Protein backbone atom coordinates (compact mmCIF):
# COMPACT_ATOMS: atom_id res chain seq x y z
CA UNK A 1 0.00 0.00 0.00
CA UNK A 2 1.35 3.42 -0.99
CA UNK A 3 2.39 5.74 1.81
CA UNK A 4 0.03 8.73 2.22
CA UNK A 5 1.31 11.55 0.08
CA UNK A 6 0.98 15.30 -0.36
CA UNK A 7 0.17 16.89 -3.72
CA UNK A 8 1.36 20.45 -4.37
CA UNK A 9 -0.24 22.43 -7.19
CA UNK A 10 1.28 25.74 -8.21
CA UNK A 11 4.39 27.66 -9.16
CA UNK A 12 7.77 26.18 -10.08
CA UNK A 13 10.53 28.30 -11.58
CA UNK A 14 14.23 29.00 -11.70
CA UNK A 15 15.62 31.79 -9.55
CA UNK A 16 18.50 33.72 -11.12
CA UNK A 17 20.20 35.98 -8.60
CA UNK A 18 22.94 38.43 -9.51
CA UNK A 19 24.99 40.19 -6.84
CA UNK A 20 27.28 43.07 -7.73
CA UNK A 21 30.82 43.07 -6.41
CA UNK A 22 30.77 46.83 -5.90
CA UNK A 23 28.51 49.83 -6.30
CA UNK A 24 26.05 49.21 -9.13
CA UNK A 25 26.51 51.36 -12.20
CA UNK A 26 23.27 51.86 -14.10
CA UNK A 27 23.19 51.11 -17.83
CA UNK A 28 26.50 49.27 -17.59
CA UNK A 29 27.77 45.72 -17.18
CA UNK A 30 28.61 45.18 -13.51
CA UNK A 31 31.13 42.63 -12.27
CA UNK A 32 29.74 40.24 -9.68
CA UNK A 33 28.39 36.73 -9.14
CA UNK A 34 25.33 34.96 -10.55
CA UNK A 35 23.59 32.12 -8.72
CA UNK A 36 20.99 29.76 -10.19
CA UNK A 37 18.57 27.92 -7.90
CA UNK A 38 15.21 26.18 -7.97
CA UNK A 39 12.28 28.33 -6.91
CA UNK A 40 8.54 28.89 -7.01
CA UNK A 41 6.38 29.05 -3.88
CA UNK A 42 4.64 25.71 -4.30
CA UNK A 43 7.80 23.94 -5.46
CA UNK A 44 9.74 25.30 -2.48
CA UNK A 45 6.99 24.23 -0.08
CA UNK A 46 7.05 20.75 -1.60
CA UNK A 47 10.83 20.42 -1.33
CA UNK A 48 10.69 21.46 2.32
CA UNK A 49 8.05 18.81 3.01
CA UNK A 50 10.18 16.17 1.25
CA UNK A 51 13.16 17.08 3.42
CA UNK A 52 10.89 16.63 6.45
CA UNK A 53 10.18 13.04 5.45
CA UNK A 54 6.94 13.40 3.49
CA UNK A 55 6.14 11.84 0.12
CA UNK A 56 5.23 14.69 -2.22
CA UNK A 57 4.03 14.92 -5.81
CA UNK A 58 4.27 18.25 -7.64
CA UNK A 59 1.72 19.36 -10.24
CA UNK A 60 3.05 22.29 -12.23
CA UNK A 61 4.32 23.21 -15.69
CA UNK A 62 7.64 23.99 -17.34
CA UNK A 63 8.52 25.00 -20.86
CA UNK A 64 10.04 22.59 -23.35
CA UNK A 65 13.38 24.32 -22.89
CA UNK A 66 16.75 23.97 -21.18
CA UNK A 67 15.57 25.74 -18.03
CA UNK A 68 12.70 23.28 -17.74
CA UNK A 69 15.10 20.34 -17.90
CA UNK A 70 17.33 21.90 -15.25
CA UNK A 71 14.36 22.48 -12.95
CA UNK A 72 13.02 18.94 -13.38
CA UNK A 73 16.43 17.40 -12.71
CA UNK A 74 16.86 19.45 -9.55
CA UNK A 75 13.39 18.49 -8.29
CA UNK A 76 14.05 14.80 -8.88
CA UNK A 77 17.45 15.04 -7.17
CA UNK A 78 15.82 15.97 -3.85
CA UNK A 79 13.15 13.25 -4.12
CA UNK A 80 10.24 15.33 -5.41
CA UNK A 81 7.90 13.40 -7.73
CA UNK A 82 7.55 15.33 -11.02
CA UNK A 83 5.43 12.87 -13.03
CA UNK A 84 2.65 15.48 -13.15
CA UNK A 85 4.84 18.43 -14.15
CA UNK A 86 3.78 19.20 -17.72
CA UNK A 87 6.29 20.17 -20.42
CA UNK A 88 4.50 22.72 -22.56
CA UNK A 89 5.50 23.78 -26.06
CA UNK A 90 5.27 27.49 -26.73
CA UNK A 91 5.86 28.52 -23.10
CA UNK A 92 8.98 29.60 -21.25
CA UNK A 93 9.83 27.91 -17.97
CA UNK A 94 8.99 30.32 -15.16
CA UNK A 95 11.90 32.45 -14.01
CA UNK A 96 12.64 35.06 -11.37
CA UNK A 97 15.57 37.36 -12.08
CA UNK A 98 16.86 39.58 -9.27
CA UNK A 99 19.76 42.03 -9.07
CA UNK A 100 21.33 42.78 -5.69
CA UNK A 101 23.86 45.30 -4.48
CA UNK A 102 27.08 44.26 -2.73
CA UNK A 103 25.26 44.33 0.63
CA UNK A 104 22.71 41.80 -0.60
CA UNK A 105 19.77 44.20 -0.75
CA UNK A 106 17.66 43.77 -3.88
CA UNK A 107 17.87 46.61 -6.40
CA UNK A 108 15.38 45.28 -8.92
CA UNK A 109 13.72 42.11 -10.12
CA UNK A 110 11.66 40.71 -12.97
CA UNK A 111 9.40 37.68 -12.73
CA UNK A 112 8.25 35.75 -15.79
CA UNK A 113 5.43 33.43 -14.71
CA UNK A 114 3.14 33.52 -17.76
CA UNK A 115 3.26 29.72 -17.87
CA UNK A 116 1.03 29.59 -14.78
CA UNK A 117 -1.89 30.65 -16.98
CA UNK A 118 -1.55 27.30 -18.76
CA UNK A 119 -2.45 25.42 -15.56
CA UNK A 120 -6.12 25.25 -16.52
CA UNK A 121 -8.76 22.90 -15.10
CA UNK A 122 -8.65 20.97 -18.38
CA UNK A 123 -4.92 20.34 -18.02
CA UNK A 124 -5.06 19.46 -14.32
CA UNK A 125 -7.93 17.03 -14.92
CA UNK A 126 -5.29 14.70 -16.39
CA UNK A 127 -4.00 14.33 -12.82
CA UNK A 128 -7.40 13.45 -11.35
CA UNK A 129 -6.32 10.11 -9.87
CA UNK A 130 -3.21 11.62 -8.25
CA UNK A 131 -5.35 14.36 -6.70
CA UNK A 132 -8.10 12.00 -5.53
CA UNK A 133 -5.66 9.63 -3.83
CA UNK A 134 -3.74 12.38 -2.02
CA UNK A 135 -3.79 12.66 1.77
CA UNK A 136 -3.66 16.46 1.52
CA UNK A 137 -3.49 19.00 -1.32
CA UNK A 138 -1.46 22.22 -1.21
CA UNK A 139 -2.11 25.13 -3.57
CA UNK A 140 -0.57 28.55 -4.00
CA UNK A 141 -2.16 31.76 -5.22
CA UNK A 142 0.00 31.78 -8.35
CA UNK A 143 -2.72 29.62 -9.89
CA UNK A 144 -5.38 31.30 -12.05
CA UNK A 145 -8.61 32.03 -10.11
CA UNK A 146 -10.67 29.62 -12.23
CA UNK A 147 -8.18 26.83 -11.54
CA UNK A 148 -8.21 27.50 -7.79
CA UNK A 149 -12.00 27.32 -7.81
CA UNK A 150 -12.04 24.12 -9.87
CA UNK A 151 -9.58 22.43 -7.51
CA UNK A 152 -11.51 23.48 -4.43
CA UNK A 153 -14.94 22.53 -5.78
CA UNK A 154 -13.71 19.23 -7.23
CA UNK A 155 -11.65 18.03 -4.26
CA UNK A 156 -12.32 20.28 -1.26
CA UNK A 157 -15.25 18.25 0.04
CA UNK A 158 -13.15 15.10 0.39
CA UNK A 159 -9.58 16.35 0.75
CA UNK A 160 -7.99 18.88 3.10
CA UNK A 161 -6.63 21.75 1.00
CA UNK A 162 -3.90 24.01 2.38
CA UNK A 163 -3.35 27.35 0.64
CA UNK A 164 -0.40 29.75 0.57
CA UNK A 165 -1.26 33.36 -0.20
CA UNK A 166 2.08 34.09 -2.01
CA UNK A 167 1.82 37.91 -1.95
CA UNK A 168 -0.50 40.82 -1.29
CA UNK A 169 -1.12 41.09 -5.03
CA UNK A 170 -2.23 37.45 -5.38
CA UNK A 171 -3.75 36.69 -1.96
CA UNK A 172 -7.25 38.01 -2.89
CA UNK A 173 -7.60 35.09 -5.32
CA UNK A 174 -8.20 32.89 -2.27
CA UNK A 175 -11.13 34.86 -0.82
CA UNK A 176 -13.82 33.22 -3.00
CA UNK A 177 -12.64 29.73 -2.03
CA UNK A 178 -12.03 30.26 1.71
CA UNK A 179 -14.87 27.92 2.79
CA UNK A 180 -13.30 25.07 0.80
CA UNK A 181 -9.88 25.41 2.42
CA UNK A 182 -8.70 23.42 5.42
CA UNK A 183 -5.88 25.90 6.19
CA UNK A 184 -4.82 29.29 4.85
CA UNK A 185 -1.35 30.63 5.65
CA UNK A 186 -0.89 34.38 5.11
CA UNK A 187 1.72 36.65 6.59
CA UNK A 188 0.41 39.55 8.67
CA UNK A 189 0.29 42.05 5.78
CA UNK A 190 -1.62 39.58 3.63
CA UNK A 191 -3.96 38.73 6.50
CA UNK A 192 -4.69 42.43 7.07
CA UNK A 193 -5.47 42.87 3.38
CA UNK A 194 -7.79 39.86 3.26
CA UNK A 195 -9.58 40.54 6.55
CA UNK A 196 -9.55 44.30 7.14
CA UNK A 197 -8.19 43.62 10.63
CA UNK A 198 -5.03 44.91 12.31
CA UNK A 199 -3.79 42.45 14.93
CA UNK A 200 -3.23 38.78 14.08
CA UNK A 201 -6.05 37.88 16.46
CA UNK A 202 -8.49 40.25 14.76
CA UNK A 203 -7.41 39.15 11.29
CA UNK A 204 -7.87 35.46 12.10
CA UNK A 205 -11.30 36.06 13.63
CA UNK A 206 -12.41 38.01 10.57
CA UNK A 207 -11.17 35.30 8.21
CA UNK A 208 -13.11 32.70 10.18
CA UNK A 209 -16.20 34.88 9.73
CA UNK A 210 -15.52 34.83 5.98
CA UNK A 211 -15.55 31.03 5.98
CA UNK A 212 -11.99 29.97 6.80
CA UNK A 213 -11.58 26.93 9.06
CA UNK A 214 -7.91 27.12 10.10
CA UNK A 215 -5.83 30.29 9.86
CA UNK A 216 -2.06 30.34 10.38
CA UNK A 217 -0.65 33.88 10.38
CA UNK A 218 3.11 34.39 10.33
CA UNK A 219 4.02 37.57 12.19
CA UNK A 220 7.78 37.82 11.72
CA UNK A 221 9.89 37.70 14.86
CA UNK A 222 6.75 37.45 17.01
CA UNK A 223 6.09 33.98 15.65
CA UNK A 224 2.85 32.45 14.43
CA UNK A 225 -0.76 32.92 15.49
CA UNK A 226 -3.04 29.95 14.76
CA UNK A 227 -6.81 30.05 15.02
CA UNK A 228 -9.66 27.70 14.25
CA UNK A 229 -13.23 27.43 15.51
CA UNK A 230 -12.16 25.65 18.70
CA UNK A 231 -9.09 27.59 19.83
CA UNK A 232 -6.52 30.26 19.11
CA UNK A 233 -2.90 30.27 20.24
CA UNK A 234 0.55 31.76 19.62
CA UNK A 235 3.79 29.91 19.01
CA UNK A 236 6.67 32.25 19.84
CA UNK A 237 10.28 31.58 18.82
CA UNK A 238 13.22 32.56 20.98
CA UNK A 239 14.72 35.86 19.78
CA UNK A 240 17.42 35.35 17.17
CA UNK A 241 20.60 37.39 17.18
CA UNK A 242 21.48 36.56 13.59
CA UNK A 243 19.14 36.00 10.66
CA UNK A 244 21.08 34.68 7.68
CA UNK A 245 18.22 34.70 5.15
CA UNK A 246 14.54 35.21 5.92
CA UNK A 247 13.40 34.54 2.35
CA UNK A 248 12.47 30.89 2.88
CA UNK A 249 10.73 31.22 6.24
CA UNK A 250 7.18 31.09 4.89
CA UNK A 251 7.83 28.16 2.58
CA UNK A 252 9.38 26.06 5.35
CA UNK A 253 6.51 26.99 7.68
CA UNK A 254 3.97 25.75 5.15
CA UNK A 255 6.05 22.68 4.41
CA UNK A 256 6.09 21.90 8.12
CA UNK A 257 2.32 22.31 8.44
CA UNK A 258 1.81 19.89 5.55
CA UNK A 259 4.39 17.33 6.67
CA UNK A 260 3.03 17.44 10.21
CA UNK A 261 -0.54 17.00 8.99
CA UNK A 262 0.40 14.09 6.72
CA UNK A 263 2.18 12.45 9.67
CA UNK A 264 -0.94 12.75 11.83
CA UNK A 265 0.39 15.31 14.31
CA UNK A 266 -2.19 17.05 16.56
CA UNK A 267 -2.69 20.71 15.69
CA UNK A 268 -0.49 22.29 18.41
CA UNK A 269 2.31 19.80 17.79
CA UNK A 270 2.01 20.44 14.06
CA UNK A 271 2.30 24.21 14.42
CA UNK A 272 5.28 23.97 16.78
CA UNK A 273 6.96 21.60 14.33
CA UNK A 274 6.35 24.06 11.47
CA UNK A 275 7.59 27.10 13.37
CA UNK A 276 10.73 25.24 14.41
CA UNK A 277 11.37 24.43 10.75
CA UNK A 278 10.96 28.11 9.90
CA UNK A 279 13.38 29.21 12.64
CA UNK A 280 15.99 26.71 11.48
CA UNK A 281 15.59 27.88 7.89
CA UNK A 282 16.23 31.56 8.54
CA UNK A 283 19.51 30.62 10.23
CA UNK A 284 20.73 29.26 6.89
CA UNK A 285 21.99 31.32 3.96
CA UNK A 286 19.98 29.11 1.60
CA UNK A 287 16.28 29.67 0.90
CA UNK A 288 15.79 25.96 1.60
CA UNK A 289 18.04 24.68 4.35
CA UNK A 290 20.04 21.80 2.92
CA UNK A 291 20.34 19.76 6.13
CA UNK A 292 16.70 20.26 7.13
CA UNK A 293 15.09 17.01 8.26
CA UNK A 294 12.28 15.75 10.45
CA UNK A 295 14.77 14.61 13.09
CA UNK A 296 16.63 17.94 13.12
CA UNK A 297 13.33 19.76 13.67
CA UNK A 298 12.24 17.45 16.48
CA UNK A 299 15.65 17.70 18.16
CA UNK A 300 15.72 21.51 17.86
CA UNK A 301 12.22 22.44 19.03
CA UNK A 302 13.14 23.20 22.65
CA UNK A 303 16.01 25.43 21.50
CA UNK A 304 13.88 27.32 18.96
CA UNK A 305 10.43 27.67 20.53
CA UNK A 306 9.38 29.26 23.81
CA UNK A 307 7.51 26.86 26.14
Task: Describe the predicted segments one by one.
Residues 87-88, 98-136, 141:
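Conserved phosphate-binding/catalytic loop of the ribokinase/pfkB sugar-kinase fold
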